[in-house]
């Protein structure tokens, strides 16, 4: 399956990396690559995430960096909707 990052998801991940980079650019790059690799694996294992809070979505939990990545499967595509840090209040809609 193809993994497609929606614009909001890309902006979310970039913002998290920018925040970390203020203190440590190497750690920010490592986080970015780690999250991207975990999300890209959804192309092979789309049912990896738990059922989502929003109907017709799933959520990949990335414990190492405290992220929740909501996504949905549409046809032969995994659509990455957002990237959220678990210590922040999650929005009601993705």
Give residue ranges: language-model regions.
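Enriched for short, Lys/Arg-rich terminal
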Residues: 62, 67-68, 72-94
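Basic, Lys/Arg-enriched alpha-helical interface segments
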Residues: 2-57, 74
